[in-house]
Swiss-Prot record:
GO terms for biological process: box C/D snoRNP assembly; maturation of LSU-rRNA from tricistronic rRNA transcript (SSU-rRNA, 5.8S rRNA, LSU-rRNA); snoRNA localization. This is Zinc finger HIT domain-containing protein 3. It comes from Pan troglodytes (Chimpanzee). Its main location: cytoplasm. A zinc finger (HIT-type) spans 1-28. Disulfide bonds: none annotated. CDD domains: zf-HIT_ZNHIT2-3. One of its GO terms (molecular function) is zinc ion binding. InterPro entries: BCD1, Znf_HIT, ZNHIT3_C. GO terms for cellular component: cytoplasm; nucleus; pre-snoRNP complex. It is found in: Cytoplasm; Nucleus.
């Protein structure tokens, strides 16, 4: 087994590849981490009032600081994602773009991710991203 590099968006269980994620999502239970949920819900939430001329830099910084180092994509891999012709081609699809907007703006992102991972177009997009980020991982399915 490889060291897990990713976490399930629903239950935060670590997984190492697309194949492992597919196996996991069949039996995923978002309530597998109730203690962590209770702790997080007990913590005070930070509210940020929108300010004019304020970029998304703060929210990006919060996001980057929110997860463990192992969950982050390297700058080189981000660059590779941006330069991928296949990924750019997929992102021209208006349906995929709408799914991405809905996911970005949605309240329950884990629920949306579970639903979208049933959509072949979104799975193709996710597989493409993972293939770029983890080029050494060959699909086992």
């Amino acid at each position: 087994l490889e060291k897990p590099k990713y976490r399930c968006p629903a239950c935060r269980v670590p997984y190492c590849s697309v194949a492992c994620f597919r196996k996991h999502k069949e039996q995923c239970n978002p309530e597998t981490r109730p203690v962590e949920k209770k702790i997080r819900s007990a913590l005070p939430t930070k509210t940020v009032k929108p300010v004019e001329n304020k970029d998304d830099d703060d929210s990006i910084a919060d996001f980057l600081n929110s997860d463990e180092e192992e969950d982050r994509v390297s700058l080189q891999n981000l660059k590779n994602l941006g330069e991928s012709a296949t990924l750019r081609s997929l992102l021209l699809n208006p349906h995929l773009r709408q799914l991405m907007v809905n996911l970005d703006q949605g309240e329950d992102k884990a629920k949306l991710m579970r639903a979208y991972m049933q959509e072949p177009l979104f799975v193709e997009f996710a597989d493409c991203c993972l293939g770029i980020v983890e080029p050494s991982q060959n699909e086992e399915s």
